[in-house]
Amino acid sequence: MIPNAQDTRVLGSEIADLKVPAVIPNTDYENEAKPAYYNDTATPMHQRMEALVLDLQDRLVVALESLEPSRKFIRDRWEREDGNGYGISCVLQDGEVYEKAGVNVSVIEGTLAPGQLRSMRERNPQTANKLNANEEYDFRVAGVSVVVHPRNPYAPTAHKNYRRFEVYRKSNKEAGPVLAWFGGGADLTPAYLFEDDVKYFHQTLKQACDAHDPQYYPRFKQWCDTYFTNIHRDETRGVGGIFFDDLEDKAPEELFHFAYDAGSAFIKAYVPLVAKRMTMPYTLRERNWQLIRRGHYAEFNLVYDRGTKFGLMTPGARIESILMSLPLTARWEYMNQPEPGSPEAHLLEAVRTTTDWAK
């Protein structure tokens, strides 16, 4: 059970020395110069996507580190044993601001396993029309995946993922991809609801979407609400954001620019929220509730998340990177039920209803 509201034992001694920087780097992507790869149409798209995800990783790590006084991200570069790709895992654990944060890049290729091919064909009729169930296919994917679990219960957890996936006929890879799409999104998972924070997060993502298609935000917001649902609990994982997959409705160049803007907008949408909440005092009550909500977060990632399941089905996959999204600590209490009218109950109302946060 959540400790009594009268429990005022203050935790989080680390907040006493935390200072919010006057300027958080890399949060003004609209006015920053575009990198060389942005308009480099002479370079193959898969190489430009690799450059994009590495750039997004670097810029987000710098922004997150600007708030953390005691630790830096560990950069762990790894190579697949079969030589078909690499990754860079940037991880920070046991910091004063971040209990666990991971910003991972993976650039890999291989052969689609039968289960992966079947899953792709079942979820999308257009994919089923382009991929023969009896044929072998190779794939190439470059992506960046982010999960941040702050220490302070009032600072929200957040997730971001952007990737490009290409599929080739194994018998004729030189002909180019028979299928290619972009996927990704960003979403917010608070333990305590600050409506202004949620509105700011959604509005920032909406601005990035609107710059490319006014239908993107409402479409991807609804998709996010549907996808990030713990069906067994009848609640969403958090308060949403945007989510899309199998996106090929525009020219690859335009979709690449959208991925750049949406991926960059996450830094602006999220890191200032951590800065805003990381110095708030909290007690054992708030800490325990945060851990309970993290338990629900872990349930979604292990039971429903498509990326986690795809990774676990991939031969030679790096399990440490796949499970990076799990929180460092979590809590499961038998028959936990917040008191009516409490801040915890207010959060549950938000994850059990649909709200237009961007209006």
How would you name each of these model-derived features?
Residues 169-219, 359:
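Compact, glycine/acidic-enriched structural inserts
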Residues 160-167, 174-191, 312-329, 333-334:
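Intrinsically disordered, low-complexity regulatory segments enriched in Ser/Thr/Pro
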Residues 198-284, 288:
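Extended, acidic-biased charged interface segments
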Residues 100-102, 138-142, 179-189, 234-254, ...:
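Glycine-rich, often proline-containing surface loops adjacent to acidic residues and nearby aromatics
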Residues 87-184:
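Internal mixed beta-strand/loop scaffold within catalytic domains of large alpha/beta enzymes
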Residues 40-129, 247, 252-283, 287-297, ...:
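Gly/Pro-rich turn-and-neighbor structural signature
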Residues 2-35:
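N-terminal regions that are enriched for targeting/export leaders
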Residues 10, 308, 314-359:
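TerminUS-proximal long segments
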